[in-house]
Amino acid sequence: MNNNYLSLFSLYFLIAGCNSHQNPSESYFPNNFNEVSQIKYVQYIIQGKILYKANCSHCHQHSGKGFRNLYPALIKSTTLINNTGSAACLIKYGTIRSGKGSNLNMLMPAKTELSNLEIAEILTYIGNSWGNQIGFISVNSVEKYLVDCTPH
């Protein structure tokens, strides 16, 4: 069983480290999961990273640092940490907000084509990268979050 954990961690760090600007050893990995939960968590992290690169990194950057005052950084994000439901709504329905300290408006495009599973995977990835430590975000959680959303 310990060999399974070692293999699982090795696979996670190998895949997460490929072509990444983030040091995989800095990713948060909860230690209170059973073996099945750990496997599911790693799957969500890996798929979430792929989805993040395809859907989010153009604005938020591969490093999660965002872009100037237009696109917020995801590093130690208070929105992710304190209001994961709001983050799920932003991914699904997008928003238009004033940029920090500027007269510019920034647009976060709606990603209505993403399934609840894909949103859960993205949230699990970004929520456990760059200093964030929110743990596993399930599809059921995303479904509950989206019920309370008001599409923009």
Regions found by a protein language model. Give the residues of each.
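Cys-nucleophile CN-hydrolase/nitrilase-fold catalytic domain and related Cys-dependent amidase chemistry
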Residues: 78
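Electrostatic cytochrome c docking/interface patches
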Residues: 22-51
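Sequence/structural segment immediately N-terminal to covalent heme-attachment motifs in c-type
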Residues: 41-67, 81-93
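C-terminal motif of bacterial Sec signal peptides marking the signal peptidase cleavage site
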Residues: 15-17
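Sec-dependent signal peptide recognition
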Residues: 2-11
